[in-house]
Each structure stands twice: as C-alpha cells, then as structure tokens.
A protein has these predicted regions:
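Canonical Radical SAM [4Fe-4S] cluster-binding loop centered on the CxxxCxxC motif
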Residues: 2-34
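Short, solvent-exposed beta-strand edge segments and adjacent coil->beta transition regions
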Residues: 4-6, 59, 155-157
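Short acidic donor-binding/metal-coordinating loop in glycosyltransferase active sites
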Residues: 11, 59-60
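Residues that line or immediately flank small-molecule/substrate-binding pockets and catalytic motifs
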Residues: 26, 59, 118
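Radical SAM/AdoMet-radical enzyme domain recognition
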Residues: 40-56, 65-177
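Acidic metal-phosphate-binding loop of nucleotide-sugar-dependent transferases
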Residues: 29, 61-62, 95-96
Length: 177
C-alpha cells in the first residue's frame, strides 16, 4: 500500500435520483475552479512518488460533472506519461447517464471499473429520477449497450450491486439479469 496513491473525488453533491434511503442532501454543489486547481496541485505533487495512482469517482452522481471527471483524469494521464506510474480509475454511479458515448469518453480517460446499484423490481420506487419517473429501463438499456462493446477494444468491469429491501420477495429479478 505504500506504493499506491488513491484519491476519492466527489465532483458534486448533486444527484439526478431521489432515493428515499439516501443520506445526501442533494445540494447542486459542484467543485469550483479553485478546488480543481488545488486538486491538480495536490495530485501533481504526490503522484510521482508512487508506482500506482487510483482515482475513485463518487458522489452525489459523478456523471453529472463529466467535464470535471475528464479534466482531472486528463491531468493524471499526462502525469502518467511523464512519470510512468500505473493509472487506474473507477466510478460509483447510478448508471442512468452512462450511455455508449459517455462510457467511451470515460474509457479514454482511464475509467474502466464501475459500481452501479439496482434495487430489483422495486427499483423505480426506491431509485426514482428527480422528475419522479422510473430509471430502471434506462439503466438496463445502457448496460445492454455496453455489454455489446467489442471486448478486444474495451476491457472494463461493472459490478452490479443489488440492495435487498425488507419487502423484496420476488427473486425472479436474478433470472431477469
């Protein structure tokens, strides 16, 4: 662990979901330019001392701040070229905005591992969009689209996390997946 530099970044407290069990207040607060500059200074000072640098994107919902994610990732990729450390990145996301186009941009930025939570058949009740509409089908469509990417070109990992809630009694969900 002495050779690994891991930074967890929360580009926004905002989220496009309104999960009733969430602990976040959903303030639409995002990183300021000053914060981004300080992150760049910090990573630039620290990264060359390590053999591996890992960025972990968290939120709120990090896909809402695509430009921030891409900017910081680009900084680390440039440092990687200069200093030769191994770079890896992961993201915890609700998966709603993770379509083909955004995934490809993030992939080029070195983000190759994702964690997406799905609440089974109750998902649309427990993980509704800020508009109140369901989100499950969009996420499933995104995942299906990503699963068709050519493995020779795209080596990535998605962990699907499933919250099992008190009233979950229909386990056919696992067959559906």
């Amino acid at each position: 662990l002495d050779n690994i530099f891991m930074v967890t970044l929360m580009p926004t407290e905002g989220c496009n979901f309104r999960c009733p069990y969430c602990y976040e207040d959903h303030h639409a607060v995002s990183m300021t330019r000053d914060t981004l500059d300080r992150i760049e200074e910090y990573i630039t000072a620290q990264a060359p001392r390590y053999k591996q640098v890992i960025l972990a994107w968290f939120g709120g919902e990090p896909t809402l701040c695509k430009d921030t994610v891409l900017e910081v990732s680009n900084i680390v990729q440039n440092l990687q070229k200069q200093y030769g450390f191994h770079y890896a990145a992961n993201m915890t996301t609700n998966g709603y905005l993770l379509n083909d186009k955004l995934f490809r941009q993030f992939y080029q930025a070195g983000i190759t591992s994702y964690q997406i939570t799905i609440d089974g058949w109750n998902h649309d009740k427990t993980r509704p969009h800020v508009s109140g509409k369901g989100t499950l089908q969009t996420i499933i469509n995104n995942l299906a689209s990503l699963s068709k990417l050519p493995p020779a070109e795209y080596s990535f990992h998605i962990t699907l996390r499933h919250n099992i809630l008190a009233d979950d009694e229909d386990y056919s969900w696992y067959d559906y997946l």
